[in-house]
């Protein structure tokens, strides 16, 4: 992949860009195999590659410059702004949206936030595309509600120019820190969730719910989990840290009892909507802390699926799962180092199969799926 920003040194986010893509994949696989060497993996499956360009469905743009000439992209530590509207990681459908948004910022009078002066209102634009329908979710991250009336008044023009904007919201982030979003989300459009679909499974993305940024690889990850679980002939399953339900909804059958747990109420609302649309009768999604839920339950499911944040599932949940001893644990991780640590604590489980998914090309990061069976 060629990137003019990388060549000039103005953006080095893709740290492995100079490394040939096959070498990227082999280096990631070697890193994973080294980490899991103590765990005697029975079967390694081939790496799931990614497209090398236009694979991201989400843009997180810092807004800088002036209200008349806004810049969308990133800020270096010295305050230098870099416009990333032509970043090759984004699909070609993003650039026309960015062009209109620059005009809209001026029309609505949304003054970009100046980090050095601590003045201005508009901090970030967060844009997510549905690969199913080509529609978008747009979030304006504002310092306060001061410009909210102006934003609402100017929205009809924006919706006329960009009818593909399905969900529009304002997030209020008042803190002078490099934090992407605050707690308050104000829905400005009729729709509150972006419709998506992977492998004939309907999924919904609300503004504050987590969703994978590489749809092609995410679809392969979910399909693989579905296929592995189908081979096991299980009747009950927990999906912990379930997000909008992507894993559980793929794995659930009409007769399986599925319980999905996620701390985000917004994500749970999306998961419930998908389950209802699929007609699943034995599925329950709850907005709870995954560790607290699991350690408070007496029943033992056949399989526990975990998809934790980068820190992993942690000692408390590892200890409880070891005592509870479900037949299988399916572990999806975006940080193989924390997963390897958790696997060490799950000493009474052996790794049946492992597969790497290249969710983040041109970086050292990747996703990994591991099936564990009680020894």
From Swiss-Prot:
Q: What GO molecular function terms would the record report?
A: 4 iron, 4 sulfur cluster binding; iron ion binding; rRNA (uridine-C5-)-methyltransferase activity
Binding positions for [4Fe-4S] cluster? 3, 11, 14, 87
EC number(s) reported in the record: 2.1.1.189
Q: Which residue positions does the secretion signal occupy?
A: none
Provide the active-site residues from the annotation.
334 (nucleophile)
Catalytic activity field = uridine(747) in 23S rRNA + S-adenosyl-L-methionine = 5-methyluridine(747) in 23S rRNA + S-adenosyl-L-homocysteine + H(+)
Q: Which UniProt keywords apply?
A: 4Fe-4S, Iron, Iron-sulfur, Metal-binding, Methyltransferase, rRNA processing, S-adenosyl-L-methionine, Transferase
Residues that bind S-adenosyl-L-methionine? 212, 241, 262, 307
**What are the recorded Gene Ontology BP terms?**
rRNA base methylation
Q: Which family does it belong to?
A: Belongs to the class I-like SAM-binding methyltransferase superfamily. RNA M5U methyltransferase family. RlmC subfamily.
Q: Which HAMAP family match?
A: 23SrRNA_methyltr_RlmC
Task: Describe its function.
Answer: Catalyzes the formation of 5-methyl-uridine at position 747 (m5U747) in 23S rRNA.
Name the PANTHER family on file.
RNA M5U METHYLTRANSFERASE, TRNA (URACIL(54)-C(5))-METHYLTRANSFERASE
Task: Report the protein name in the record.
Answer: 23S rRNA (uracil(747)-C(5))-methyltransferase RlmC
- Name the gene: rlmC
């Amino acid at each position: 992949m060629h990137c003019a920003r990388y060549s000039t040194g103005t953006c080095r986010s893709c740290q492995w860009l100079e490394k040939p893509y096959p070498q990227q994949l082999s280096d990631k696989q070697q890193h994973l195999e080294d980490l899991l060497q103590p765990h005697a993996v029975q079967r390694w499956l081939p790496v799931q590659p990614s497209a090398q360009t236009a694979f991201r469905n989400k843009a997180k743009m810092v807004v800088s410059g002036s209200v008349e000439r806004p810049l969308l992209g990133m800020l270096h530590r010295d305050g230098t702004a870099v416009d990333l509207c032509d970043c090759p990681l984004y699909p070609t459908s993003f650039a026309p949206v960015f062009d209109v948004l620059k005009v809209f910022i001026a029309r609505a009078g949304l003054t970009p936030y100046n980090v050095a002066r601590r003045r201005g209102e508009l901090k970030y634009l967060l844009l997510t595309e549905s690969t199913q329908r080509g529609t978008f979710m747009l979030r304006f991250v504002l310092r306060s509600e001061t410009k909210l009336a102006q934003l609402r008044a100017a929205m009809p023009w924006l919706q006329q120019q960009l009818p593909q904007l399905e969900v529009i919201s304002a997030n209020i982030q008042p803190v002078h820190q490099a934090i992407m979003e605050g707690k308050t989300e104000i829905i400005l459009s009729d729709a509150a969730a972006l419709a998506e679909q992977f492998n004939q499974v309907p999924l919904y993305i609300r503004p504050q719910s987590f969703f994978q940024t590489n749809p092609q690889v995410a679809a392969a990850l979910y399909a693989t989990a579905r296929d592995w679980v189908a081979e096991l002939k299980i009747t009950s399953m927990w999906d912990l840290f379930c997000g909008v339900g992507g894993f559980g909804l793929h794995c659930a059958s009409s007769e399986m009892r599925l319980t999905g747990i996620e701390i985000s109420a917004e994500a749970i609302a999306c998961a419930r909507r998908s389950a209802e649309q699929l007609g699943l009768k034995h599925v329950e999604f709850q907005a709870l802390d995954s560790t607290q839920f699991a350690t408070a339950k007496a029943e033992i499911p056949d399989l526990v699926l975990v998809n934790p944040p980068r820190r992993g599932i942690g000692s408390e949940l590892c200890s409880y799962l070891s005592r509870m001893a479900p037949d299988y644990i399916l572990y999806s991780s975006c940080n193989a180092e924390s997963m390897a640590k958790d696997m060490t604590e799950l000493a009474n489980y052996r790794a049946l199969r492992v597969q790497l998914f290249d969710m983040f090309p041109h970086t050292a990061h990747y996703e990994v799926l591991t099936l564990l069976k009680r020894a």
